[in-house]
Regions:
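Structural beta->alpha junctions
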Residues: 1, 30-35, 255-259, 284-293, ...
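Solvent-exposed, non-transmembrane loop/terminal regulatory segments of multi-pass membrane proteins
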Residues: 217-218, 225, 243-289, 295, ...
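A structural signal for short secondary-structure junctions
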Residues: 273-278, 309-312, 395, 403-410, ...
Length: 630
């Protein structure tokens, strides 16, 4: 809280905040300002992303249902669930990470999904002649279990993020899970109440999908074997391209918003002075004795100076050496100084004789004599037995920038700034390696650190973190399904859309060479949790529902699956406009994953079910008539 307050004070005090110095434009820049401006951008974007997601979902629902009353029935449980979750956030969180805003977009899509499946089944039962009470009873008895199971898998997907080593993802995990829980509770309790209210109205307000998706519902019956072969080929090709994924090398792109005024000002200044002053690296070492540390620091300074002269990649550096010298060096300097003081009378006599014999005017000779006397006075005022002291204490403050005591040791810090043209991530690594190789000759180990190094350490294990959290989510989903489903075949069939969608997502990311930010670890759990929802309705309707069939279940689920998939996609689309790369990337990855899950759920999965059904029928014993020998 202190840093934003201090920055606000600086902005008020700089000249361009007032009426004076109108011709001078001042800028605040540097690492702290980068982070502050990026946070301010997030604060502005949070509300915009929420409103855009809400508007996109609302527009989509209105274009599909074409009834304001139907949209109100669908959105009311959603608004109730999100409102409860924001109240929960307010009670338990002091700060919200930008990535957590992804949970809001997810809730806008998934929260609508629960209501869409329930209202869609109610509409179907009413069209078949059932009463309102019968429609509600059958809906909750047959469609309710898949909705509950889908919500449970979504919550497990979010909760798996709590096993991450990154605090932002942990926060996203429990807030996303709580949001799904609140939205589910709101939906299950409000839909019956809203249905009773709608039934009493003279006009039919029960939601009815006005867009036909019949061509998709029939697609799986046309060459199902070819559908399975093509889907398998696409998934295998995606796995091949997925092998090329790697984390984003432009680390400041990952952690800071793009197109910021502070970074633009920093780049202009860096180009002007040929030094990337805002992103220094730090070389540090620990010693037990200050004098030993000062001697090592002088050696380190010499190594850096040689690297500067030889490679021209280091623009400048600062260390304690320009403020303090080792006692041994000071004694040598004092000895040389005392020699000058002792020989001063001889030097003064020689100077006066030379001045007398010169052809200088009296005025010029007088000026030179005054300068010589001033130099004598300066030497006389120096005390070589005591170090220079700053009466205002600023020297002590400045020394603390380069040397501090940590427990029983003293840590020395050297600030190193690279040239402004050293921007390529690989080139930066090479310069780091060259410095570390050069300092190996020092008697103490030297460490390298800085903002870039810290960012790189966070991102370096992204891929392993992705598969670790993904495996947790996968195992949790499979376990839940094995407990609920009466046979493993149903579990395997439900996994087809989510596993295929995840593989295709990674393949597209690898093919497009998109660098992975830390938000990538959300992708596997979310796709595993959400990609399975619609598949459950098809599998349960085909295999485990009374008088169910593949064609009947697919025809029933397809319209609702298309609407729910589109609403989930709309929840993520608004993130594509974000200036924060992790949010933008999460939106893009989830859109790819959800788009991929649609054909896998509505075409590939029914095709697999149809082939299994035909194989089962074809395996029945046949009667063979013996042929008489000729």
């Amino acid at each position: 809280e202190a840093i934003p307050k201090k920055i606000a004070e600086l902005r008020k005090s700089i000249p361009n905040a007032g009426d004076q110095f109108k011709d001078i434009k001042w800028h605040l820049t540097g690492k702290v300002i980068f982070q502050q401006e990026s946070s301010e951008i997030f604060d502005r974007e949070s509300f915009v992303i929420l409103i855009c997601s809400f508007a996109l979902v609302l527009t989509l629902l209105f274009s599909i249902y074409r009834s304001f009353g139907s949209v109100v029935l669908l959105m009311t449980p959603l608004v109730g669930g999100i409102g409860l979750n924001y109240g929960f956030m307010y009670l338990i969180c002091n700060e919200i990470n930008p990535v957590v805003m992804g949970a809001t977009g997810v809730l806008l899509g998934l929260g609508t999904e629960y209501a869409e499946h329930l209202w869609g089944r109610i509409r179907e039962e009413l069209d078949n002649g059932a009463s309102h009470e019968e429609a509600l009873t059958r809906t909750y008895a047959q469609t309710g279990p898949p909705v509950l199971l889908g919500a449970l898998t979504g919550m497990l997907a979010f909760l798996s993020l709590c096993l991450s080593r990154q605090s932002a993802l942990i926060q996203l995990g429990y807030l996303g899970a709580s949001g799904l829980a609140f939205t589910l509770i709101s939906t299950l309790f409000l839909v019956p109440a809203l249905a009773v209210i709608a039934a009493k109205r003279p006009k039919d307000y029960f939601p009815r999908i006005r867009v036909s998706f019949e061509f998709i519902a029939r697609s799986f019956k046309v060459h199902p074997a070819a559908v399975v072969i093509v889907s398998t080929a696409v998934i295998l090709a995606s796995l091949y391209y997925a092998s090329g994924i790697s984390y984003e090398r432009d680390l400041f792109k990952v952690f800071l918003a793009r197109n910021m005024e502070s970074t633009t000002s920093s780049e202009i200044i860096s180009q002007k002075f040929h030094s990337d002053f805002s992103k220094p690296i730090y070389l540090s070492f620990d010693v037990e004795d200050v004098q030993e540390g000062l001697m090592v620091q002088r050696e380190l300074d010499g190594i850096i100076e040689k690297l500067m002269d030889k490679y021209h990649q280091i623009a400048s550096f600062d260390s304690i050496s320009y403020l303090m010298s080792p006692d041994a060096i000071r004694k040598e300097n004092a000895k040389a100084f005392n020699g000058v003081v002792e020989s001063w009378p001889t030097l003064e006599q020689t100077f006066k004789e030379g001045l007398r014999n010169s052809s200088l005017s009296k005025n010029a000779a007088h000026v030179m004599q005054e300068a010589f006397d001033a130099t004598k006075g300066l030497f006389s005022s120096l005390d070589t037995d005591k170090p220079l002291q700053d009466k205002n204490g600023f020297a002590d403050l400045e020394c603390s920038w380069y040397m501090t005591k940590i427990k029983d040791k003293y840590r020395f810090l050297t600030h190193v700034r690279y040239a402004d043209d050293i921007k390529d991530p690989q080139q930066l690594k090479e310069v780091d390696a060259r410095i570390m190789k050069a300092v190996r000759q020092l008697p103490v180990p030297v460490r390298i650190s800085g903002t870039r190094q810290a960012m790189e350490e966070i991102l370096s294990d992204l891929v392993s973190e992705l598969f670790r959290l993904g495996s947790y989510a996968f195992a949790a989903v499979v376990l839940i399904f094995l407990i609920i489903f009466p046979q493993p075949r149903g579990v395997a069939l439900c996994l087809i859309p989510m596993v295929g969608a995840f593989c295709i997502t990674l393949g597209v990311l690898g093919l497009t060479k998109l660098g992975l930010p830390f938000s990538i670890v959300c992708v596997a759990p979310l796709i595993f949790g959400f990609g399975i929802h619609n598949g459950m309705h098809i599998v349960m309707g085909s295999l485990f529902e009374d008088k169910g069939s593949i064609e009947k279940a697919t025809r029933r689920v397809t319209p609702r699956a298309m609407v729910t998939s589109l609403t989930i996609i709309m929840g993520f689309v608004s993130m594509l406009s974000s200036r924060l790369y992790p949010l933008e990337f999460l939106g893009a990855a989830m859109v790819i994953g959800m788009v991929a899950s649609v054909p896998l759920t509505l075409i590939t999965l029914p095709a697999v079910l149809l082939l299994l059904e035909r194989r089962k029928k074809g395996s029945a014993p046949e009667t063979h008539v013996p042929v008489a020998p000729q």
